[in-house]
Structures are given as structure tokens and as C-alpha cells.
Amino acid sequence: MGRDTIAEIITSIRNADMDRKRVVRIASTHITENIVKLLLREGFFENVRKHRENNKNFFVLTLRHRRNKKRPLRNILKLKRISRPGLRIYYKSQRIPRILGGRGVVIISTSRGIMTDREARLEGIGGEILFYIW
């Protein structure tokens, strides 16, 4: 039985955010590297470092928290896995959903690599909807 590395990333980030931890450590694979670069570019992480320990590569992610007047350093990320190994979900470029009117991000695996919903619409290509983040 294979591992769902995308679900592991989502779970690690969600658990660290709910625990108010600023740093998350996830295993490094080709797909996780692409997803982490994309989320860093979209502003969900402050910093990403590659770390090697016992011949295994890891990413050390620093979560971005927004300051709030009532509760400092509080920003709960919402992540939802859509396509999974048992049920793949594909959309054409015209049918890609918008999350919170465009404030959220849909991560899509296309024939040209992993990209956001905005990039996929601009290029006019669809693909597998991996997850939502807002």
C-alpha cells in the first residue's frame, strides 16, 4: 500500500497551525518540493529550508502568522484534500473552482507541472485538483 505524500503534507501543516507551532518538518520528495515552492510563492510560508538528517532529506517550513489585535500570531489555515488515490478529480480550465471568490488557492497537477488555479486558467489547461488552501 502506497503513501499519500500530499495528504501527509496537508496534515502536518494543519496540525502545526492548530498547535500554534511556527515550524513544520516534512519529508522531501519531488512532488512535495514543487508544492512547497508554490505555497512559498503564494505567501503561506515565511521561509523554507532543506535539511538532511540520517541520509534523509526534509523541508523545514516556517509558517506565516498574521497579527490580530485580540489574539497575536493567529492565522488558522484551512486545507482540504480533493483528489486522492482512490478517487481522482479532474477539471477542464474553464471549470476550475474559485475558493472564497479568488482569495483561496487551488493547487492543480497539470501536464506542465503543479500550479495554482490562476496560472492554469491563464495557460488554458486543466488537470487534477490536489487540494484547496485558504
From Swiss-Prot:
Q: Key word Electron transport present in the record?
A: no
Read off the InterPro entries from this record.
Ribosomal_uS8 (IPR000630), Ribosomal_uS8_CS (IPR047863), Ribosomal_uS8_sf (IPR035987)
Which BP terms from GO are recorded?
A: translation
What GO molecular function annotation could you give as one example from this UniProt entry? structural constituent of ribosome
- Which key words tag this protein in UniProt? Plastid, Ribonucleoprotein, Ribosomal protein, RNA-binding, rRNA-binding
Subcellular location(s) per record: Plastid
Q: Which domain of life is it from?
A: Eukaryota
**Mainly localized where?**
plastid
UniProt-listed Pfam families: Ribosomal_S8
What GO CC terms are in its UniProt record? plastid; ribonucleoprotein complex; ribosome
Q: Which family does it belong to?
A: Belongs to the universal ribosomal protein uS8 family.
Q: How does it assemble?
A: Part of the 30S ribosomal subunit.
What HAMAP family has UniProt attached to this entry? Ribosomal_uS8_B
Q: What does this protein do?
A: One of the primary rRNA binding proteins, it binds directly to 16S rRNA central domain where it helps coordinate assembly of the platform of the 30S subunit.
Q: What is this protein called?
A: Small ribosomal subunit protein uS8c
